[in-house]
Amino acid sequence: MKSRYLLFFLPLIVAKYTSAATMQPFHSPEESVNSQFYLPPPPGNDDPAFRYDKEAYFKGYAIKGSPRWKQAAEDADISVENIARIFSPVVGAKINPKDTPETWNMLQNLLKMGGYYATASAKKYYMRTRPFVLFNHSTCRPEDENTLRKDGSYPSGHTAYSTLLALVLSQARPERAQELARRGWEFGQSRVICGAHWQSDVDAGRYVGAVEFARLQTIPAFQKSLAKVREELNDKNNLLSKEERPELNY
């Protein structure tokens, strides 16, 4: 008898905790706004703006080994587990597949939309050389370097993602908007400190994230998911206590 009940309920249990992982993206890569069309070209070697890029790079390289450098290394990891760890205290609520499955799925979906789809056309078109390659330096996360060498630097996908994520989470938890905006900004700036991107890559990434945010507002599936995220992140059982949500230095 028990085995029959188990066979009946097991698919339902599995479905509950795997539905987030199998949910489809909100739109296809082809339906993204074409970043190669709307972004200006990255600064050339003779452009005065490139001097600013180099200054920003060396400013970041000068603090190698510092706590801020180590934060940049942590920010470089865009696995859903790490992003949840970083943004959970900022949003002031749990983010995990058990308690907040829709939010967990949203983190992964926004990475596809903002970090990959929205930046792809400009990255492929310009294939800009990354600063650590030009200067033959190491980044804050050496294990990523072989992949980064083959991926265009402009615009920054990490930055587009963090900008988009901060904006969407602010829709769900508007009372945490200033903290989310600040952490999203820091996350993008980490790419310059890490040596993976030029400042102009990060600046462009912020705009790409904002454009993708506007694109998602027109999609019913996103709005439906956002409503569930809002419900999860405002559930009293998922809110973090002051002890679990340390005060941020903002």
From Swiss-Prot:
Entry's localization field: Periplasm
A cellular component annotation (GO) from this entry: outer membrane-bounded periplasmic space
Keyword terms of this UniProt record: Hydrolase, Periplasm, Signal
GO molecular function terms listed in the Swiss-Prot or TrEMBL record: acid phosphatase activity
Chain ranges passing through the membrane: none
Top enzyme class: hydrolase
UniProt EC number: 3.1.3.2
Listed InterPro entries: Acid_Pase_classA_bac, Acid_Pase_classA_bac_CS, P_Acid_Pase_2/haloperoxi_sf, P_Acid_Pase_2/haloperoxidase
Quaternary structure and partners: Homodimer.
Family: Belongs to the class A bacterial acid phosphatase family.
Name of the protein described by the UniProt record: Non-specific acid phosphatase
Encoding gene (name): phoN
